[in-house]
Amino acid sequence: MSIRFPEIPGTTRAPGTSLSSRGIFPTSPGVPQIPTTPNSYSALLHPHKSEAKGKHPLSFSSSMTKRLTPQEKKARRPTSRACVFCHSKHLQCSHSRPCQNCIKRNLAHECRDVVRKRAKYMSTTEVPAVSGESSSESGRATGENGSEMGNPPDPQIAYLDGVFERSSIHESLQDSPMSTPASNFNSNFLNQEYMMLGDLISKPSSPSLDVPMMYAENPSRPFISLGQSDERPKSPEFNNFDFSSLDKAQYVSPLVSHHIYQNVQDIYANKVIDFDYPSSYHSLTSFLRQRFSFTGKSLSDSEKAKKRENLLMILRLIASYRPTFISTHKALFRPFDFQFLEMSFQRCLLDYENLSRLNASPTIIWRRTGEIVSMSNDLVALLGLNISTILSKRTFILELMYDDESIVEYFRLFESVAVGNLHSTIVTRCKLIKRPSEGIETNTSMDSDYIEFCSVWTVKRDLFDLPMMVVGQFLPVLPTPDGFRTY
């Protein structure tokens, strides 16, 4: 079957000549000639029939559109950025320049990477220049003048210096050769993530939460209620406190820690304060030497010898588990292990405090160094103590013990569970000091200066099997007029 095209009036066609030679389909150099065979005209009029057979009527070469084998598809690697031609034609571009598609089409001289349009949120915002050259020059002149060197710095100027320093850090981060510019990433998601990281680095770090001693020992702090309500009172002074002015080396009292970590969310939201165990042990040693010293006391020779013997016994008990504690402490990875251990401690402390509110047993919670971190209201009222005085400074459980025998027995029991023995419960008896403060009445009518207790200790261990926390529940032994003891 052949197709006959109508003759255009005024034109004649010589035998054997094509339509393009008569000017109907003009030719131009560089454009491939369209064949005028009947099959070609049929392909032009019905292109869908040719496509159904897997052939394109205007295909340049069979090698350019040949089907790839599964091995070839698996072996080829897509490039991160295509060239202009492959990007416009939605073709698979290669890594080499010029790419294979451009070489096959004789477009090797025009093969270049496509230039992508930058999103609006990726555009860099320039920091507005501060018009203050005259003020900076006057500031340098003031620094050169010797008579004005003693003036304190202006807080507002110091704030501006901090702002300019952070902006300079951000600019150096963008212009640094070690950092990769945002335009080198070929994904908008990577570019956005890179910009967010730059903002995090340029912004100031989270405020420190180390509270100085002058605030930790302030007697005007409120009382921390452990048994009445879940919410602890907050003073306006603590809310307006500037955490950024704190020093990490300073001690943070348990009272301030109670303000910072009031729930589980606060432990993960705020910066974790590492606890300095060596300093706590040094304070414990100083207390023991002061407690068992007999200088300035009217003691007999036998009493002095007894105190000296008790102190040496305590030091020998401490020396038995001290090397294990030191070696484990040195093996920790700073600062992450210390932060993890302190987070675990604060998390367990919240759980045990919530548990102490559910029962009426007088409870004291202390660290492995003996430093008290929590105390129930029942025991505070029973001993006539002030909770703010106990928790606002470094107070050891040994300071509440009445006699030296109770202190020696404490170290003997703690040494039995410090290393090796993993028994987590201890039952013992001890005597605690009953010293009513001014304006505070105790619940006991005893005339003695102490109260004898039967206590149960629960030892909570950390990840390294060291005693992390000791929860002591104390049941008072009250004498009756008949000579029988009641619990």
Curated annotation (Swiss-Prot):
Transmembrane segments: none annotated. Pfam families: PAS_13, Zn_clus. Residues 348-420 form the PAS domain. Its main location: nucleus. It comes from the Eukaryota. Keywords: DNA-binding, Metal-binding, Nucleus, Transcription, Transcription regulation, Zinc. PROSITE patterns: ZN2_CY6_FUNGAL_1, ZN2_CY6_FUNGAL_2. SMART domains: GAL4. Residues 59-68, 122-139 have a biased composition (Polar residues). One of its GO terms (biological process) is cellular response to starvation. Disulfide bonds: none annotated. It is found in: Nucleus. Residues 1-75, 122-158 are annotated as: Disordered. GO terms for cellular component: nucleus. Residues 83-111 bind DNA. One of its GO terms (molecular function) is DNA-binding transcription factor activity, RNA polymerase II-specific. Transcription factor which regulates nonfermentable carbon utilization. Belongs to the ERT1/acuK family. This is Glucose starvation modulator protein 1. The lineage of its organism: Eukaryota, Fungi, Dikarya, Ascomycota, Saccharomycotina. The gene is GSM1.
